[in-house]
Amino acid sequence: MNEQLHNRTMAFAGILQAIAQVQYLARHGESDTDELAASLHTILVTDPETPADVYQDKAGLHKGYQLVLNQLGDSSQKDVEITRYLVGILALERKLARSNSGLSMLAERINQVNRQLHHFAITDEQVIANLASIYSDIISNLGPKIQISGNPLCLQRPIVQQKIRALLLAAMRSAVLWRQLGGKRRHLVFARKAILDTAKKSLTL
């Protein structure tokens, strides 16, 4: 398996996995704690030796790879809402990459959260609130806001809003890695078959 393509597909699966949790939270007001923790942990791995170090829960990416197949395959499973969120995240990532001040502030704020983890679990409400505020303060202001659709009763709850923003930050983290590994939007069209083949193989590893 082409290592660069494997790593790039892994990062793309990470984006989709975080986005899918946003969608589920917005509709149902709850999330799987293990999946949430796995996505949020990726935010804090800022200096990985290898791309795989970002995704310490390898089994947790299973759903992400399945989403790659659903979104890029000739499938009735393709979700237009997931695609809309993906386009929004990739657009914001481009804005972030061009903002030296944004990148500097992001690194500083993530270091603060890392220190907080000496005392709290990553799924603690206080940690989630801090991750959410990083997204609101730094990422959300870079460009058009991503409009989240869902159940209004769920979306009114502060903890749901905070988890959604924290997960959007996790999606951004994977988008940054995807771009660092050479990922480009045109690959999703012109290299679609290779990405699909890689996702299928990754599901069986």
UniProtKB/Swiss-Prot annotation:
Q: Which UniProt keywords apply?
A: Cell inner membrane, Cell membrane, Cytoplasm, Membrane
Q: Name one GO cellular component term.
A: cytoplasm
Name the InterPro entries on file: HflD, HflD-like_sf
> What is the top-level taxon of the source organism?
Bacteria
Q: Give the record's membrane topology.
A: Peripheral membrane protein
Q: Has the keyword Secreted been applied to this entry? A: no
- Pfam families xrefs: DUF489
Location(s) in or outside the cell: Cytoplasm; Cell inner membrane
Q: What is its main location?
A: cytoplasm
Similarity comment text for this entry = Belongs to the HflD family.
PANTHER family under this entry? Answer: HIGH FREQUENCY LYSOGENIZATION PROTEIN HFLD
Q: What is this protein called?
A: High frequency lysogenization protein HflD homolog
Which organism's genome codes for this protein?
Shewanella oneidensis (strain ATCC 700550 / JCM 31522 / CIP 106686 / LMG 19005 / NCIMB 14063 / MR-1)
Gene giving rise to this polypeptide: hflD
